Each structure stands twice: as structure tokens, then as C-alpha cells.
């Protein structure tokens, strides 16, 4: 039986910048805030962390820093994926040596690999790093959609451990849960899908919103895991406005603005991302005010 890397909420950490350099002071404060608020795991170098604009050296430094800062208090999952199989495998190997508890590997994008090619891509990564591998399906970004049939094949590979599902397709979640039951752990990749996915067996979420509200997202997942659907739904409805506005522009633009408004970092992004519009800022401000965050 597959044992989950974590149960509950994992935050897909933002990467704070100051004058185009990684702001480790702010990152350290964000990590401590997350831990104090009861988050269950942390993901570094993911989409929310602007991984595509980080250099290889920056990615390695971020992984090392986060592992060291957490010091075993929660699992650290390192985003190591890419569309170059060898490079993704090497970064995954590095993450393991740095002390990461698992890796998050996005489906290989742009290349349009065959189903067999995608399976082989993940096989090589898993064999290289010998860490729990979380497969990340986000077709809106990658142009590739992993199917329940692909998951079934992946679940037979040692170290292919879990799925972060962000395809928005509830029918496919059911088939994935059926085909991979006991062999791969399912996690939601969208805050707004979390409770629905947990109702069919997902063990939690990799969350964007938990950058801002880690305790609420963690409490929501905990309530659902304990069978308190009423309590979980109450938290979900309270947070629904924020879940929505954090995706009114491309992630992580809104969440970085929100974190800046709360005083955690500068509102600084790397191109080609740019700051959100004044209209979006007002919408985010309203959501933060309604939750008593500013």
C-alpha cells in the first residue's frame, strides 16, 4: 500500500525577489509563517515559485535552502520537472542528495511526447533519483494531458508515488482514483477542486492560496480527512472568494501581489510575467479585507 508523502495541505511557495535576486530573508520569514500556521508540507521551485525563470543554480540553491530551513519539520517536495528528460532526472537526483522528501515533476511540455515516451520519461527520472515522484498534470500550461491509462502504467514503476491533478476534469479523477487505488496517492492541484477530489480519495492539495491562508487551507483538509464535511465546507465557502481571485490573472501574479500586501515580500516578478492590473489589485484587496488579512 502506498503511504502518502503528506496528508492535508502543501503550499506551493512563491519565490520572493528583491532587485531581481532571490530574497532569502523574505523566503525564510514566509517558511516560518507557514510552519507556525500548521501547514503540512512545502513545495519549492514549482509554477507558483516562477521556476521557469530561475537559473539551474538558483533552483539548486532554493531547494537546499528550503530543506535546511524546514529541518525536517514538514516534508519538502522539490519541483524538478522539465521537458528534457536527462536534465529533469539530474535535477531530481540533486534534490534527493539535498535532502528533499520527494519531487514534483510536471508532464513534459511542448515536445508532445507519445504516451510511451511520457511513461519512459518518468521511468528514467524515478530510476535516477530513487525518491517518491509526484507526477504533475496541468494541461492548461503544458499542452499535454495525462490520462487515467497513462497513470495506470506509471503506477507500476517503482518510486512513481503520487499525482498532482490540475486538469479540472472530474470524470477523469474518478477513473484515476479507480485505476491507481492503493498504488498512487492523489492530490488536488487546484484549491477550488480540493474537497471534491478528497471526496473520492485524494489526500489533500498542493495549494496556491495557502501562501496567504495556510491555517485555513490546512484546517479545511484536516476536517475533510476526519470526516467533518460540514466544517470543511464551511471553511471552503469562507475562502471561495480568495480561491477565485488568486486565478483572475495567471498564477503567481495575484498571489505575489497578495503576499506583498500582507507585508511578506516585494511585489516583484520576473518577465515575461508582469504585475496585475489596478482593477485586479482592488479585487484582491477586497478578498483579503473580507478575510481580515489586511
Question: What is each stretch, according to the model?
Answer:
Residues 2-5, 37, 175-178, 184, ...:
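Catalytic cores of TIM-barrel enzymes
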Residues 2-11, 15-143:
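Active-site beta->alpha loop and helix N-cap motifs at the rims of alpha/beta catalytic domains
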Residues 5-15, 33, 37-38, 199-202, ...:
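C-terminal alpha-helical cap/extension of soluble enzyme domains
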Residues 6, 27, 59, 63, ...:
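A general structural signal for well-ordered alpha-helical segments in protein cores
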Residues 61, 65-70, 94, 98, ...:
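Alpha-helical structural signal in soluble globular domains
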Residues 84, 190-191, 277:
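Helix N-cap/beta->alpha junction signal
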Residues 127, 141-247:
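Catalytic alpha/beta core domains of metabolic enzymes, predominantly
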Residues 137, 159-160, 270-271:
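Glycine-rich phosphate-binding "P-loop"
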Amino acid at each position: 500500500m502506498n503511504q502518502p508523502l503528506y496528508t492535508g495541505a502543501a503550499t506551493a511557495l512563491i519565490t520572493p525577489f528583491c532587485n531581481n535576486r532571490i530574497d532569502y530573508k523574505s523566503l525564510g520569514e514566509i517558511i516560518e509563517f507557514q510552519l507556525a500556521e500548521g501547514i503540512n508540507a512545502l513545495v519549492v521551485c514549482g509554477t507558483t515559485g516562477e521556476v521557469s525563470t530561475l537559473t539551474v543554480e538558483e533552483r539548486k540553491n532554493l531547494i537546499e535552502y528550503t530543506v535546511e530551513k524546514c529541518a525536517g519539520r514538514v516534508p519538502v517536495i522539490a519541483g524538478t520537472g522539465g521537458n528534457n528528460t536527462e536534465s529533469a532526472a539530474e535535477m531530481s537526483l540533486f534534490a534527493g542528495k539535498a535532502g528533499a522528501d520527494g519531487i514534483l515533476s510536471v508532464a513534459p511540455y511542448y515536445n508532445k511526447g507519445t504516451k510511451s515516451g511520457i511513461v519512459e520519461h518518468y521511468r528514467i527520472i524515478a530510476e535516477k533519483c530513487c525518491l517518491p515522484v509526484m507526477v504533475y498534470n496541468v494541461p492548461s500550461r503544458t499542452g499535454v494531458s495525462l490520462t487515467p491509462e497513462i497513470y495506470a502504467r506509471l503506477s507500476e514503476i517503482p518510486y512513481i508515488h503520487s499525482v498532482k491533478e490540475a486538469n479540472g476534469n472530474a470524470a477523469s479523477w474518478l477513473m484515476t482514483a479507480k485505476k491507481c487505488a492503493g498504488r498512487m496517492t492523489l492530490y488536488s492541484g487546484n484549491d477550488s477542486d480540493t474537497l471534491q477530489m478528497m471526496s473520492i480519495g485524494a489526500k489533500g492539495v498542493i495549494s496556491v492560496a495557502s501562501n496567504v491562508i495556510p491555517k485555513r487551507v490546512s484546517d479545511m483538509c484536516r476536517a475533510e480527512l476526519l470526516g467533518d464535511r460540514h466544517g470543511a465546507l464551511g471553511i471552503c465557502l469562507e475562502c471561495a472568494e480568495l480561491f477565485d481571485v488568486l486565478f483572475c490573472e495567471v498564477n503567481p501574479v495575484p498571489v505575489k501581489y497578495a503576499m506583498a500586501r500582507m507585508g511578506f515580500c516585494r511585489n516583484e516578478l520576473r518577465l515575461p510575467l508582469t504585475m496585475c492590473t489596478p482593477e485586479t489589485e482592488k479585487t484582491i484587496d477586497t478578498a483579503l479585507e473580507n478575510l481580515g488579512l489586511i
